[in-house]
Amino acid sequence: MQLTAVGLNHQTAPLSIREKLAFAAACLPEAVRNLARSNAATEAVILSTCNRTELYCVGDSEEIIRWLADYHSLPIEEISPYLYTLGMQETVRHAFRVACGLDSMVLGEPQILGQIKDAVRVAQEQESMGKKLNALFQKTFSVAKEVRTDTAVGENSVSMASASVKLAEQIFPDIGDLNVLFIGAGEMIELVATYFAAKSPRLMTVANRTLARAQELCDKLGVNAEPCLLSDLPAILHEYDVVVSSTASQLPIVGKGMVERALKQRQSMPLFMLDLAVPRDIEAEVGDLNDAYLYTVDDMVNIVQSGKEARQKAAAAAETLVSEKVAEFVRQQQGRQSVPLIRALRDEGEKARKQVLENAMKQLAKGATAEEVLERLSIQLTNKLLHSPTQTLNKAGEEDKDLVHAVAQIYHLDK
């Protein structure tokens, strides 16, 4: 089985497909353990973010696709058009590019590197990684660090979090006059909330499944932040001008009916809603309502392109560095794969040497001259070492040109 990757991202699949193939954080340990113990793969890492789901494996790509479809109870033909399947070298290149932010919606964004590290940590905890994936991701983190240190690819990047504030400012002139509701209390919400907090909104509320986690985030945000439970949403939604949601829920949290009731109470005041979750937290039909401005991760593309031109120049240098590191890694791995063969070859040579030497000692004991023994020894050793390759070449026909070329290279006969 070889190193391979199967996946889809914001470039190959719309949100409606990506959300069907996303892995919830709570399910990820069981999923990666299951994959690494299936007939599809012997090693596995699953990366699942709002913009991509990727399975890095040592395995069979067709079986991995079948496993992915079965896991999500989807027909293969429904997901296949959106998937990419990568061979060994392209898997290495892709992993390096993703970690460097070169494949991100926001060119050079740093958050993806942390997400890859989290995915690797989960895989390690589930013992689903072996020598090949460990080597790949150790090199991936090293390359990402070098690219981000030696190039300007990540400078001036507009993050999804900062873009959220920019988008809200297009609808409301002053964030300071707004009540902002955050649904969820994970990493993405914390990043977005931090940007909003810098604009000093009138009120910030964090709604979460557990009050303790909501309170923890409120404590970080400042005095004008308060916690509440998700179950409170129907009663309080109308009080907020901005709603940002990003949870790990597999089902929508905010439905069209809930928003309709909130809009009636708001009396035509606009409600800005940003759904950064995959799968989506807010029903898509909410976008059809008057005075409800619903945006998803796919709607953020134009906003996050700010400063992209300057970063693209830096990206060219980053791509060159990535290509060099890919070639270096592939050479190292191919060298390691040859080690057992080299050992076996040397063992065979040593075996032949001992046999010929034993014969020579017997001849000397019988009174043969040293010259005769050395002559016979050299002929026997030559015959033993060349017997197997000579036999193989005699059997090889014209169609086996690769073998003939390989032998010519090994013995430097192609000059």
Curated annotation (Swiss-Prot):
Active site (record annotation): 50 (nucleophile)
Protein residues bound to substrate: 49-52, 104, 109-111, 115
Domain of life: Bacteria
Pfam families: GlutR_dimer (PF00745), GlutR_N (PF05201), Shikimate_DH (PF01488)
UniProt keywords, alphabetically: NADP, Oxidoreductase, Porphyrin biosynthesis
Miscellaneous notes: During catalysis, the active site Cys acts as a nucleophile attacking the alpha-carbonyl group of tRNA-bound glutamate with the formation of a thioester intermediate between enzyme and glutamate, and the concomitant release of tRNA(Glu). The thioester intermediate is finally reduced by direct hydride transfer from NADPH, to form the product GSA.
Name of the encoding gene: hemA
Catalytic activity: (S)-4-amino-5-oxopentanoate + tRNA(Glu) + NADP(+) = L-glutamyl-tRNA(Glu) + NADPH + H(+)
Family matches, as PANTHER family: GLUTAMYL-TRNA REDUCTASE (PTHR43013:SF1)
Keyword DNA-binding: no
Function: Catalyzes the NADPH-dependent reduction of glutamyl-tRNA(Glu) to glutamate 1-semialdehyde (GSA).
EC number assigned by the record: 1.2.1.70
Stored Gene3D superfamilies: Glutamyl-tRNA reductase, N-terminal domain (3.30.460.30), NAD(P)-binding Rossmann-like Domain (3.40.50.720)
Record's subunit section: Homodimer.
Record site: Important for activity: 94
Name the record gives this protein: Glutamyl-tRNA reductase
One BP term from GO: protoporphyrinogen IX biosynthetic process from glutamate
GO MF entries: glutamyl-tRNA reductase activity; NADP binding
Cross-referenced InterPro entries: 4pyrrol_synth_GluRdtase (IPR000343), 4pyrrol_synth_GluRdtase_dimer (IPR015896), 4pyrrol_synth_GluRdtase_N (IPR015895), GluRdtase_CS (IPR018214), GluRdtase_dimer_dom_sf (IPR036453), GluRdtase_N_sf (IPR036343), NAD(P)-bd_dom_sf (IPR036291), Shikm_DH/Glu-tRNA_Rdtase (IPR006151)
Enzyme class: oxidoreductase
Gene source species: Neisseria meningitidis serogroup C / serotype 2a (strain ATCC 700532 / DSM 15464 / FAM18)
Family: Belongs to the glutamyl-tRNA reductase family.
